[in-house]
């Protein structure tokens, strides 16, 4: 089986073409391949499939390092777009893909960045999903003997966003896993720790569901900006600095799609005999 290793700001992926190859990945196999000592090593496995819908170019599947399948990965979407162009699976600059949670358009820019239409952020609790009687801009959660104020949103996957004074000293190792599996998130959640520098610039660390803290999380960056705009703390165009680098997020508010722009890097190609 042939594959490529790619990354978006250090958030790394094994990308597999299932259009021209017959592949099957059990959760156990994914865990073995994800191991950084004895396998390929990656945060997520991305699979390129033939479209289920004739209006789409491809179907996009994402698996975490623990073998669980998820509906969205923003950094992965940018790598997906670069991969299908690099491998000659498509020549268009605007690539339409379906996912578990809907549809996306991935656009290659003139400077080889990738702009992803991430769709409209979803704040209704039952769509996140998040257990709450009604939608609020801020929720109070009790976790790890602490009281936490957070925003909750779905970007195709569930996110919880906490504002912190300094990401360097944020209790990511304690609050990340505790909030990820909090009882009010029935499908677990990705946890973002956001430091606001000014209305157009934030710093962010993300503890990803099923993975742990990563160098970057595209959907997490989108979620943080969406929550910041909803809470009237941020403007519509925001630079997000993550440990692995920067992303640029644009959202014009309710009823409009959110756009994420950033890099996608090809590292190497490989072959595995399974």
Swiss-Prot record:
Its main location: cytoplasm. GO terms for biological process: lysine biosynthetic process via diaminopimelate. It is found in: Cytoplasm. Pfam families: DAP_epimerase. One of its GO terms (molecular function) is diaminopimelate epimerase activity. Substrate binds at residues 11, 44, 64, 74-75, 157, 190, 208-209, 218-219. Its EC number is 5.1.1.7. InterPro entries: DAP_epimerase_AS, DAP_epimerase_DapF. It comes from the Bacteria. It catalyses: (2S,6S)-2,6-diaminopimelate = meso-2,6-diaminopimelate. The keyword Cytoplasm applies. The active site is at residues 73, 217. One of its GO terms (cellular component) is cytosol. Catalyzes the stereoinversion of LL-2,6-diaminopimelate (L,L-DAP) to meso-diaminopimelate (meso-DAP), a precursor of L-lysine and an essential component of the bacterial peptidoglycan. Belongs to the diaminopimelate epimerase family. This is Diaminopimelate epimerase. It comes from Photorhabdus laumondii subsp. laumondii (strain DSM 15139 / CIP 105565 / TT01) (Photorhabdus luminescens subsp. laumondii).
């Amino acid at each position: 089986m042939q594959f490529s290793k790619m990354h978006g700001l250090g958030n790394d992926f094994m990308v597999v073409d299932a259009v021209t190859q017959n592949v099957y990945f059990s959760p156990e196999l994914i865990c073995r391949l994800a191991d950084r000592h004895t396998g390929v090593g990656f945060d997520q496995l991305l699979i390129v499939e033939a479209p289920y819908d004739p209006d789409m170019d491809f179907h996009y599947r994402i698996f975490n390092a623990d073998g669980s399948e998820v509906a969205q990965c923003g950094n992965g979407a940018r790598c997906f777009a670069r991969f299908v162009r690099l491998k000659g699976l498509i020549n268009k600059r605007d690539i339409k893909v379906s996912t578990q949670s809907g549809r996306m358009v991935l656009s290659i820019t003139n400077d080889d960045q990738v702009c992803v239409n991430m769709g409209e952020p979803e704040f209704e609790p039952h769509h996140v999903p998040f257990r709450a009687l009604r939608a609020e801009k801020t929720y109070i959660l009790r976790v790890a003997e602490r009281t936490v104020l957070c925003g909750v949103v779905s970007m195709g996957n569930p996110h919880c966003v906490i504002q912190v004074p300094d990401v360097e000293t944020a209790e990511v190792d304690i609050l990340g896993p505790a909030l990820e599996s909090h009882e009010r998130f029935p499908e677990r959640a990705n946890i973002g720790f956001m430091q606001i520098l000014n209305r157009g610039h934030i710093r962010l660390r993300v503890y990803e569901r099923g993975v742990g803290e990563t160098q970057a999380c595209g959907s997490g960056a989108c979620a943080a900006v969406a929550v910041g705009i909803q809470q009237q703390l941020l403007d519509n165009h925001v630079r997000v600095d993550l440990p692995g680098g920067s992303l640029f997020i644009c959202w014009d508010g309710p009823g409009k799609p959110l756009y994420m722009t950033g890099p996608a890097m090809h590292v190497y190609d490989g072959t595995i005999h399974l």
